[in-house]
Amino acid sequence: MKKLLAVILALTMVLTLAVPMLAAAEAPEEITILYPGEETDEMSAFLNGAFAEKVLSELNMKVNFRFLSWDAYWDQKSVMLAAKEPIDLYWDGLPDLSTMVNKKEAQPLDDLIAKCWPESMKEILPESQMAGGRINGVQYGIPSAYAPSSGMYQFVCLRQDLLEKVGMTEVKTAEDLREFALRVQEQLPQFRGPADVIFKPLTRNFAEEQYTWVASQDLVVFGEESKKAYSFAHTQAFQDVAKYNREMFLDGLYQDEVAIKYNERDSRMQTGLYLWVEGSLGKENEIIGSVKTADPEAVLKNYLLQPEKPRYINATGGEVLCVPYSAPNPEGAMKFLAWMWGSQDNYLFCLYGEKGKDWDLDENGRLVTLSETARGDGYFYEWMFRNANYQVFSADVSDEYIEMYKHWDDAAVPSAMLGFAFDNTGFEAIETACNEAWKKVEPILFGYVDFDENYPAALAELEAAGINEYVAEVNRQLEAFMAK
C-alpha cells in the first residue's frame, strides 16, 4: 500500500511539473512589426480577427503592429530604434539601406535566413533579388518587392481621365505636364493641382545624362554615362528642376502643402482631387481603388518623361525589410516572412483579406475584389510585398499591359553601380552636417522659395558642411566597386 501511495505521489508531482511546462511550450511566440500609415478600423478588425486567428493556427504566433503616420514615420522610426524599443521587423526604402547599416539600425540576416527559411524561398526571392540587400557581402535587408524595376523613381502617375477631358492625350515632357496643369486650372478649377513636386521624374526630364541617387538621402547622384558621383545640388539638372517648380508655385499650380507636407503626396493623390504624383511601374493599378473611391470616374496612367532616354536597373526594387539589433524575436520575424511568402494563398490573404469574403480569383486567374477594403487600399501594402511569383491582376487590366509589365526590364540597362552601398565610416559627421544643410536646399528644389535669392547661400552652407569631401569619398568607393 505504501508503495502504491508513493507511486501515486510521484506521478502527481510529475504531472504538476509537466502541466506548466506543456503550457509554456504551447504559448505562442510574438513579434512586433513597425508599419507606416494610419491604422484604420478595417485594418484593426482584420489584424485582430482573421489574421490573428490564421497566424496563431498556422505559426503559433501573435503578430503585433505599431503604426506610425507617414509624415512622422522616418523620424520616429529612427528615435525608436535608437532607444532600442522592442521592434522585430520594419520597412524602409532600399536606397537607404546603407545609411541604416551605418547607423546600426539593421542586423545581419545570413544566419537567420539559413536557420529559418526553407529552400523554397530561393525561388520566391531569388539570388539576384536578395543581392540587392547585401552590403560588403553581408545580407542586411530583404528587398521585399520582387518585380520589374527599371526607371524607378522616374515615373509620373497622373489622372488620364482629366488629361483627356482638357483636350490632351499623353505627356512626354515637363512642359506637357505644365500645360496639363494649366488647362485643368482653367477648365476644372475644383481640382487642386499636382499632389507632388516629382523632383526625381523631373530630373530625368532635364538631366544631360540619367542620374541615380546614391549614398545618404538626396545629397549625391551617380551619372549613368559618366560613371561618376556628383553633388545633386551642384548639377544643372537641380537648377532646372528648381526653377521649373518655382514657376509652378508662382502660377498657382502647386499648393503649399506639396512642399511643406511632401511625404503625404500619396495620401493627397488618393483623395481624388489632385492631378499627379511620382509613380512606379504598376502604381496606376496599385492606387486606383482608393482614387476611385473618392472619384468613381478616375482613370490613372503612368508616364516616363523623355521616354526615348535610356532606362537603368539600379536596384532590386525600392523596398527593404530589416531586423534591428534590439529585436526581441528576430527568428520569429523571419519565420513570419517565410510564412507570408510561402504560398499564394497566404500572400493574397495578407494583401486583400479572406478568400471568398474579400477577394477571389476568376476562371482566368484574375483578381476579383469582393469587399470595399479589398477594392481600396487592401490590408498589407501590395507595393511593399509585391512578388512576381504570386502577383495577380484584375480583369480590367488588359493582356497587353500585363505583357508589357512582365517584359518591362527586357530593354533596360543594368547600372554600373547596381549593388553598390556607400560605407560612411569616418564620414559620419560630414554626412550629418550635409543632411542638415540640405534642409535649406530642399525648399529651393521644391520651388517653395525663390531660386536666385536663396540658392547661393544654401550652396555655400552645403559646401561648408563638407559636401565636396563627401562626394570625393563616394567616388573613391564607386571606383573601387566598379573595378571588381
Annotated model-derived regions:
Residues M1-I8:
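Positively charged n-region of N-terminal signal peptides that target proteins for export
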